[in-house]
Amino acid sequence: MKAVIISIGDELLKGHRVNTNAPFIARQLGTIGIPVSRIITCSDDPQSIRVAVTSALEEAEAVLMTGGLGPTNDDRTRTTVQELLGRGLVFDEPSFERIAEMFRRRGRPVTEAMKAQAMVIEGSVTVPNTKGTAPGMIIECAPQFAGRYLVLMPGVPVEMEAMMQLTVIPFFEPLSGAFIRHTPIMTMGIGESQLSGLIAQVEDELPSGTTLSYLPHAAGVSLMVSTSGSRKEEVDEQNRRVVDAIVERARSFVYAIRDARLEEVVVETLLEKKMTVAVAESCTGGLIASRLTDVAGSSGCFLQGLVTYSNEAKVAQLGVDPLTIEELGAVSEPVAEEMARGCLERSGADIAVSTTGIAGPGGGSPEKPVGTVCIAVASRSGKGDVTVEASTFSMHGDRQQNKARFSEAALRALLVRLKQPGS
């Protein structure tokens, strides 16, 4: 079985919205061994929808559509598909009751007009919308397209994602005829070419049915080990062996064997070690603190964050020596070290990280160009001694890109220190 994804909406074609639905659907289908052969984006025009659906049903056994199920005039997917298949619309009472209950909870009146949202194509399996109003549908398209299935879902990402996970994937899993295992390996502080060299032997000896993909990201490179086959136990075992071989060779660069953001692993590590953290930021403007506190459970380890953007704030809030700034400049490793030490001592945290740099577009010099950042990590030993280490990095990007990369480097430095023996 293979699939085609159709994303409907003029807003996608005009660039007013980024299509995040198609990648999500493709990833979900991949977990049950259904590859996507094509992704189509088409307008709200009924003829465009009709052409796209007909073409997709001729190509693939499963066609998944998003968009065009709402109550407005440009939501034409349901009507177009109904006419294409020569079927009527029927009222789905459970869907209407779900919609009505949602409106009652919000204190809004329930009207007859809402019944239009609960109309589904005759012969379809209703996909409950647990996050919104319009239900989805799974339609077996015989006799026109024997052995073909059409899935209609709303274009709102949160609604579509719930439908995929709760109903659509469980529906198609028994039909896929294959087992597939995807295992992500997240690395940091290493480029694609260097990583490829480290694991070249593993890649050269990949068993049949297993593939390896490189996906560069801000922290480093994520590897995706994918294994498919007809027997689940064999697929799992083969995938595990390849993952183990890669990790054995690249262990010092691997920070997670799952799809995880760097800040998630930092927080998890802090909680495991029962350690607390504080951050002192200049050029990143609170981004590190924001990323850490975005992680659920971070209140158990995150003490405080200071944005000491000016030199005066560095001196007053962190105890940085003004002579250090005067002699070496605010963007220097000694200043970063004093920021981290001051943050550690004044917060009472077990570990602290600091950033001072030049995000751009102005402020650079030949000696310290835009993209330069100094990052320091300070931590306490078991005896209470403080260790501080700083490094300088050079990034290339616009202001927002540099800030994001600076924060990534700081989180990476934090995690490296946390993983050191004795931390």
UniProtKB/Swiss-Prot annotation:
Any single Pfam family the record assigns to this protein: CinA
Taxonomic superkingdom: Bacteria
Bilayer-spanning residue ranges: none
Alphabetized InterPro entries for the sequence: CinA (IPR050101), CinA-like_C (IPR036653), CinA_C (IPR008136), CinA_KH (IPR041424), Competence-induced_CinA (IPR008135), MoaB/Mog-like_dom_sf (IPR036425), MoaB/Mog_dom (IPR001453)
Family recorded in the similarity comment: Belongs to the CinA family.
PANTHER family in UniProt: NICOTINAMIDE-NUCLEOTIDE AMIDOHYDROLASE PNCC, NMN AMIDOHYDROLASE-LIKE PROTEIN YFAY
Protein name: CinA-like protein
